[in-house]
C-alpha cells in the first residue's frame, strides 16, 4: 500500500526547518490489512468506472490513511433543511461540528493539511522522459510507481483517444503526444490499453498532424528525447543572459516562472543536448509522424501547431524575431569566434540553474522548472552532486490518489493552511478545536522564510524574501505576495488569542519582516504582483513564446494578490499602528484604488488563479469590506452583489465553468450544476458586502445548498476543479471543498444568524 509521509527527510536532503511541511508518498508492499487493500482497490475501480463523468480524484487515499491515524469522536447524523424550512442555528452548528471534526482528522501531525494540487496534463510526462534519458527511471520509479503512473494516464485519456492540456480539457497535441510517449517509455505496447487505448491515441495524434504539430514546449521536450530536431525549434539563445540589464528583453525582467523555464532550456538548447537514441526512440520516430523522419521539413515545423493547442497565436512581430534568430543569429553564434561567447553564456545559464537549485533546496519554483533543471544538471555532469540532489527531491513533487500517481505543481501546504485557519476561526468554536488550531499555529510559525536568498541575490534577479510565506513550505523559499499576506493575517489573529490555547505568539519583528516584503512588491498603479516587483513593459507580452498560455512572460498585478495584501496590511495597522504607518496607509489607499479600477462593468472581478469571476470577486469584496466599505457606502460593492445575485442558480447555489477563465466570459457549469466551493465564495462575498442587511434571502438559499450537500462522514463531495493559472490551465485544490463551505457557514452563523 501507499503511505503518505509527513515532515520526514531522506539521504542527502537538506532542510531549514526539519522538513516541516514536507509531504511525500512511499510504497510499502507489506502495509495494510486485506480489508484496507480491498477498500483502496474499490475506490480505484469506482474512479475508473466514472472517469468521464468526474475527472478529479476525491483524494481518498490520503483521507483514508489520515482518518485511521487520527480517529475522531462519533458525530451526529447530517442535517437536511427543506426548501420551506427556516435555517436554525442548531442546523448550522451541527453541520459545522461535523465538518470540523472531519477536517481536523485529516490534519497532519506537523499542522498542515495535506492535499492534492494537480490537474495539468504536462507535469508528469517530462519526469518520465527525463529519467529515461538519464537512465534512472527504474531507480526512482519502482514497478509500483510505474503502475500508478500508467493508471493515471489511462484514467485521464479522453474518449476520443487524446489527452487534454488539463484533465477537464479537450484533447490537445501537447497532452496526447507527451502521454503516449510516456506510456511507451513505461512499457506499454502499440495495441495495449483498454479498448485499444494506445492505438486510439496514436490515431488521434496522426489525424491531427503528427508530432510536428506539438507546441513549442512540447517540441523542446521531444527534441531533448531524440524524437525531433533542434532545427525545428525556435531558438533559445543563452547569450540573452549577457544583455545589459537595462534592455527591456533581458531575462531578468521576465516573470520568474518564465525566467526559470528559460534558464535550463537555454542551456540545453545552447548545447544542442539530445538523449541517447535507443531502439524505442527509433520506433517512436516511425509511430508519431505522417511522413518518414528524414523527409520532414524542420523549418516549416518550427511554426506548425495543432489548432486544438492554439490558445495564444504568435503575433507577426514574434515570428519575425524567431526567424531572425533562427536564420541569422544562431549560425553566427555557433561559429568561431562567437562560439567562445556561447561557451561563456552556457556557464552563465547553468550558474543561474545552480543558484535556483541551492536556494530552493532542489525543489525549484515549480515542477515544470524542476525537471528542466534536473536534466540540465545531468547534461552538465551525469555524476555530479547537483543531479543526485535533484533525484532526492523528486518525491516532493508527486501525489498518489485513487486515479493514480500524478505530479503536482509543488504543493499548496501554506496556502491551504492559511485559509483553513481563517475558516476554523470564523466558526467561534476555538475551545472545542484548540488542538487543531495549536498545531496549525506551529506550522505557520515554522513556515516563514527566515533569510533572504544567498549571496548577491539581486545580481541573480531575485527579490527579498525574509519574512515571507511561500505557497508550500519554508524550504521552497519563493515569496508570494498573497501567501505572505494570508500568513501575516493568521499570525496576527493567533497573536490575539490565549497562548495556553494556541501556543506562544509570533515575535512582532517577524511580522515587520512580512510587512516589508508586502510593501516592497506594490506597483505604481497600486496593484500587487505575485512573486516579484513588476519590472517589464506590457508590450513584452507580445513575445510570449507559449501557444497555450496567456500573460506568461512578465509579472503583472492581480486582484487576488492586491486584496490579501490590502487586507493583511489593514489588520496589521489595527494592532501595530506606529510601524511604517504612513507608508501602510498610502499602500492601502492605492491598493483600494487599484481594486476599484479593475472591476468589470458588470460588477465582477476576473480571477486569474481561481475560477473565475466568483473567485476574483470574493477577494476584492473582502479587501474593500476590511477597509470599511459596505453595500450602503460603496457603489463597487453594490454592483458586485447585483452581479452575484444575477448568477445564482434556481437551487440557490453558484456554479462557474473553467471556460469562464479561458474565454473571459461567465459560463455556467454544464447542466447548470452548483459547485460548493464557488457557492461558498459567493456567500462570503455577499456576507462581507452586508447584503444580508438589504435582503438575506439569497444568502439563506445558498447556505441551504451547503448544509444539504454534506456527506455522512462530515466531508463535502469533490466536484469540478476550481483553480486555474495563466487563464487556460486548471488546477485542483482538494482541500477547497472542506475549507470554503466551513468558512461560509462560520461567517453565516456569526454575521447573519447572530446579526
From Swiss-Prot:
GO terms for molecular function: lupeol synthase activity. Its EC number is 5.4.99.41. The active site is at 482 (proton donor). Keywords: Isomerase, Repeat. Coiled coil: none annotated. It is an enzyme of class 5 (isomerase). It catalyses: (S)-2,3-epoxysqualene = lupeol. Belongs to the terpene cyclase/mutase family. This is Lupeol synthase. It comes from Betula platyphylla.
Amino acid at each position: 500500500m501507499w503511505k503518505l509521509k509527513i515532515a520526514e527527510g531522506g539521504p542527502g536532503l537538506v532542510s531549514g526547518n526539519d522538513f516541516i511541511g514536507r509531504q511525500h508518498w512511499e510504497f510499502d508492499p507489506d502495509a495494510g490489512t486485506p480489508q484496507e487493500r480491498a477498500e483502496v482497490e474499490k475506490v480505484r475501480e469506482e474512479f475508473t468506472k466514472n472517469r468521464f463523468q468526474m475527472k478529479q480524484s476525491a483524494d481518498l487515499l490520503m483521507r483514508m490513511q489520515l482518518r485511521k491515524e487520527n480517529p475522531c469522536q462519533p458525530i451526529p447524523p447530517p442535517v437536511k433543511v427543506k426548501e420551506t424550512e427556516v435555517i436554525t442555528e442548531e442546523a448550522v452548528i451541527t453541520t459545522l461540528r461535523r465538518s470540523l471534526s472531519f477536517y481536523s482528522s485529516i490534519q497532519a501531525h506537523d499542522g498542515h493539511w495535506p492535499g492534492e494540487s494537480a490537474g495539468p496534463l504536462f507535469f508528469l510526462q517530462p519526469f518520465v522522459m527525463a529519467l529515461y534519458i538519464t537512465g534512472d527511471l527504474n531507480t526512482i520509479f519502482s514497478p509500483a510507481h510505474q503502475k500508478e503512473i500508467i493508471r493515471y494516464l489511462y484514467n485521464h485519456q479522453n474518449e476520443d483517444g487524446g489527452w487534454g492540456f488539463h484533465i477537464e480539457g479537450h484533447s490537445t497535441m501537447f497532452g496526447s503526444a507527451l502521454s503516449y510517449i510516456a506510456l511507451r517509455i513505461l512499457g506499454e505496447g502499440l495495441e495495449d490499453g483498454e479498448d485499444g487505448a494506445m492505438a486510439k491515441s496514436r490515431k488521434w495524434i496522426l489525424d491531427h498532424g503528427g508530432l510536428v504539430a506539438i507546441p513549442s514546449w512540447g517540441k523542446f521536450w521531444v527534441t531533448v528525447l531524440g524524437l525531433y530536431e533542434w532545427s525545428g525549434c525556435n531558438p533559445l539563445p543563452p547569450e540573452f543572459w549577457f544583455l545589459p540589464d537595462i534592455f527591456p528583453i533581458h531575462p531578468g525582467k521576465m516573470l520568474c516562472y518564465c525566467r526559470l523555464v528559460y534558464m535550463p532550456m537555454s542551456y540545453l538548447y545552447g548545447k544542442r543536448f539530445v538523449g541517447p537514441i535507443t531502439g524505442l526512440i527509433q520506433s517512436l520516430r516511425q509511430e508519431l509522424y505522417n511522413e518518414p523522419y528524414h523527409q520532414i521539413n524542420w523549418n516549416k515545423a518550427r511554426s506548425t501547431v495543432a489548432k486544438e493547442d492554439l490558445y495564444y497565436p504568435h503575433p507577426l512581430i514574434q515570428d519575425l524575431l524567431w526567424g531572425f534568430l533562427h536564420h541569422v543569429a544562431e549560425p553566427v553564434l555557433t561559429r568561431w569566434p562567437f562560439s567562445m561567447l556561447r561557451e561563456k553564456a552556457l556557464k552563465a545559464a547553468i550558474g543561474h540553474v545552480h543558484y535556483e537549485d541551492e536556494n530552493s533546496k532542489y525543489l525549484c519554483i515549480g515542477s515544470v522548472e524542476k525537471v528542466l533543471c534536473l536534466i540540465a544538471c545531468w547534461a552538465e555532469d551525469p555524476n555530479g552532486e547537483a543531479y543526485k540532489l535533484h533525484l532526492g527531491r523528486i518525491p516532493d513533487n508527486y501525489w498518489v490518489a485513487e486515479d493514480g500517481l500524478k505530479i503536482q505543481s509543488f504543493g499548496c501546504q501554506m496556502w491551504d493552511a492559511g485559509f483553513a485557519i481563517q475558516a476554523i476561526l470564523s466558526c467561534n468554536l476555538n475551545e472545542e478545536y484548540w488542538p487543531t488550531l495549536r498545531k496549525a499555529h506551529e506550522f505557520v510559525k515554522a513556515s516563514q522564510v527566515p533569510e533572504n536568498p544567498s549571496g548577491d541575490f539581486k545580481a541573480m534577479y531575485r527579490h527579498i524574501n525574509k519574512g515571507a510565506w511561500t505557497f508550500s513550505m519554508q524550504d521552497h523559499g519563493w515569496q508570494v505576495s498573497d501567501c505572505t499576506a494570508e500568513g501575516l493575517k493568521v499570525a496576527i489573529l493567533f497573536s490575539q488569542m490565549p497562548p495556553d490555547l494556541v501556543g506562544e505568539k509570533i515575535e512582532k519583528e517577524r511580522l515587520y519582516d512580512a510587512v516589508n516584503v508586502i510593501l516592497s512588491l506594490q506597483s505604481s498603479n497600486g496593484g500587487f504582483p505575485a512573486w516579484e516587483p513588476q519590472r517589464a513593459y506590457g508590450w513584452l507580452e507580445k513575445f510570449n513564446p507559449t501557444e497555450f498560455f496567456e500573460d506568461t512572460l512578465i509579472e503583472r498585478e492581480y486582484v487576488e494578490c492586491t486584496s490579501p495584501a490590502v487586507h493583511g496590511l489593514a489588520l496589521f495597522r489595527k494592532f501595530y499602528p506606529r510601524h511604517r504607518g504612513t507608508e501602510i496607509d498610502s499602500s492601502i489607499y492605492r491598493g483600494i484604488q487599484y481594486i476599484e479600477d479593475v472591476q468589470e462593468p458588470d460588477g465582477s472581478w476576473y480571477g486569474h488563479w481561481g475560477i473565475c469571476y466568483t473567485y476574483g470577486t470574493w477577494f476584492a469584496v473582502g479587501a474593500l469590506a476590511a477597509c470599511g466599505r459596505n453595500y450602503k457606502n460603496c457603489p463597487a460593492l453594490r454592483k458586485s452583489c447585483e452581479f452575484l445575485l444575477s448568477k445564482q442558480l434556481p437551487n440557490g447555489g453558484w456554479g462557474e465553468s473553467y471556460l469562464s477563465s479561458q474565454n473571459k466570459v461567465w459560463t455556467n457549469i454544464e447542466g447548470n450544476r452548483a459547485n460548493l466551493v464557488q457557492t461558498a465564495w459567493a456567500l462570503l462575498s455577499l456576507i462581507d458586502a452586508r447584503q444580508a442587511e438589504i435582503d438575506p434571502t439569497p444568502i439563506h438559499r445558498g447556505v441551504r445548498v451547503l448544509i444539504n450537500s454534506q456527506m455522512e462522514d462530515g466531508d463535502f463531495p469533490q466536484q469540478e476543479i476550481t483553480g486555474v493559472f495563466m487563464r487556460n490551465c486548471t488546477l485542483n485544490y482538494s482541500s477547497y471543498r472542506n475549507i470554503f463551505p466551513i468558512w461560509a457557514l462560520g461567517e453565516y452563523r456569526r454575521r447573519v444568524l447572530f446579526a
